[in-house]
Every structure is written in structure tokens, then in C-alpha cells.
Regions:
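The beta1-alpha1 cofactor-binding region of Rossmann-like NAD(H)/NADP(H)-dependent oxidoreductases
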Residues: 39-40, 61-71, 103
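Residue(s) in the substrate-gating loop at a strand-loop-helix junction
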Residues: 141
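Alpha-helical segment proximal to the catalytic Tyr-Lys
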Residues: 126, 171-175
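Active-site loop-to-helix junction immediately N-terminal to the catalytic Tyr of the SDR YXXXK motif
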Residues: 101, 147-156, 168, 178
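Active-site helix of classical SDR
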Residues: 121, 158, 166
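Canonical Rossmann dinucleotide-binding motif of NAD(H)/NADP(H)-dependent dehydrogenases/reductases
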Residues: 3-33
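Substrate-binding pocket helix/loop in short-chain dehydrogenase/reductase
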Residues: 97-98, 105-107
């Protein structure tokens, strides 16, 4: 078990790719905190992991709220004693051309996909430092690298922002053993 003794927090972990990530991490021995706005699905994923012999905790999380992140990371550390891994998985998509994109549409995608990982990373770093280091995994997309008419400008911009957030954070916190 490659992750035995480690504690992972996965945003958007209630269903889909995030739930799969949570189960994989648990299968490798990590205790897993599942943060999501989808409480019923999150509790179901938590139960599946716990019933299969893993350790999981569901915590409510609105990735666009700094206080929600602080509460979720705090609950994780209170339950498991540390934080070693953060997976910023929560995300939303959008389609359409820029001239038909409302400011609210733009803000929603940017808040979840870019601000969310920023706030999660900010909340996780102090706890990772206490643990002697950690790993931050930000889920992006190939659409963060290339433009296409098949997606939306706000989605592609948000995924490009995640890539540079990841690179900058890794460089700034490498001396702390956080990558």
C-alpha cells in the first residue's frame, strides 16, 4: 500500500472522477476526506470506502468559500491528525461563444475551477507544512493548453490558470517539501 499512513483530501469527491480518486487512494492505504456540495452522494462514497475496509470522512465543501475550505481542512485534521495530499478535483464546465457568455457564467466557472484550487491550496499548505511536506494535485485539462472552438473561453481560461497556479505553487513551496 503506497499511501499507508497518509491523509488525502479530495474536492469534488462525492461522485464521478473524484469518487473514483477517493476509492483508489483508500485502496492504496490513505485515509480520505471527501469534500463536496453533494452531501448525499458524498456520504454514499464515504460509506462505500468505510465498508470496504478503508477510512473515509465526508465534509461539506463549497470550493468558492475560503471559510468552507478552512472548516473542511480543519475537520480532516481533527479526524485523521494530519494532511499529506490535496486533490483539487471539483470543477464545472461550460460551452458557448464569448459574445453569448454572461458575466455570471464566466464568474461561476472561474470561481469553481480556478478560485477553488487557489483557496484549497491556501488552506492545505499550513497543515502540509506541519506534516513535513505534501503533494497538491490540481486536475486540469488539455483545454488548459490549447484553444478550441468546441469549448468555452471561461472553461479554457480556468484550466489554463490552474496549470500556472500549480507550477508557481510547486516552485514557491518546494523548500517546504510541498509539491
Amino acid at each position: 500500500m503506497r499511501l499507508a499512513g497518509k491523509v488525502a483530501f479530495i474536492s469534488g469527491g462525492a461522485r464521478g472522477m473524484g469518487a473514483t480518486e477517493a476509492k483508489l487512494f483508500a485502496n492504496e492505504g490513505a485515509a480520505v476526506a471527501i469534500g463536496d456540495v453533494l452531501e448525499e452522494a458524498g456520504k454514499r462514497t464515504e460509506a462505500e470506502i468505510n465498508q470496504s475496509g478503508g477510512q473515509a470522512l465526508f465534509v461539506p465543501l463549497d470550493v468558492t468559500s475560503e471559510q468552507s475550505w478552512l472548516d473542511a481542512i480543519g475537520a480532516t485534521v481533527a479526524k485523521f491528525g494530519r494532511l499529506d495530499i490535496l486533490v483539487n478535483n471539483a470543477g464545472v464546465s461550460a460551452h458557448g461563444m464569448i459574445e453569448f457568455t454572461t458575466e455570471a457564467d464566466w464568474d461561476r466557472v472561474m470561481d469553481v475551477n480556478s478560485k477553488g484550487p487557489f483557496l484549497g491550496t491556501k488552506a492545505a499548505i499550513p497543515e502540509m507544512r506541519k506534516s513535513g511536506g505534501g503533494s497538491i494535485i490540481n486536475i486540469s485539462s488539455q483545454l488548459g493548453l490549447v484553444g478550441t472552438e468546441m469549448s468555452s473561453p471561461q472553461y479554457q481560461s480556468s484550466k489554463g490558470a490552474i496549470r500556472l497556479l500549480t507550477k508557481t505553487t510547486a516552485l514557491q513551496y518546494a523548500p517546504d517539501g510541498i509539491r
